[in-house]
A protein has these predicted regions:
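Extracytosolic ligand-binding ectodomains
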Residues: 1-106
Length: 106
């Protein structure tokens, strides 16, 4: 919720940003996930202290931070330690995506 509010404030503060977002302040379903992916790469680059591909890959299991979608950590082989999925359904009446809930597995 805080992420959505922050993005909407950022979009509405500048007419050009709002126009580039399709003329509205809707937040796409994958925005938060994309943000966390970007921040994950940034954290791996910082830990690696290099842009060398092998060094960044080797740093991935050590990435650990609080993302907007929850804690971001990886196991020793580089798989994300996640047990949830963000599920939305297509609302064909209104033409929007409806958030169902965060689904957990395990």
């Amino acid at each position: 919720p805080e992420f959505d509010t922050g993005i909407k404030e950022w979009l509405n503060a500048n007419p050009d940003k709002l126009t580039n977002n399709g003329g509205n302040d809707m937040v796409a379903a994958v925005t938060a996930i994309g943000y966390d992916a970007y921040m994950t790469a940034l954290e791996a680059l910082k830990l690696a202290g290099s842009t060398d591909r092998a060094a960044v890959l080797a740093a991935m299991p050590n990435v650990s931070f609080e993302g907007v979608t929850g804690p971001i950590t990886f196991n020793e082989i580089g798989d994300a330690n996640r047990d949830g999925a963000f599920i939305k359904t297509a609302n064909t009446v209104d033409g929007v995506w409806d958030f169902v809930k965060v689904q957990t597995v395990g």
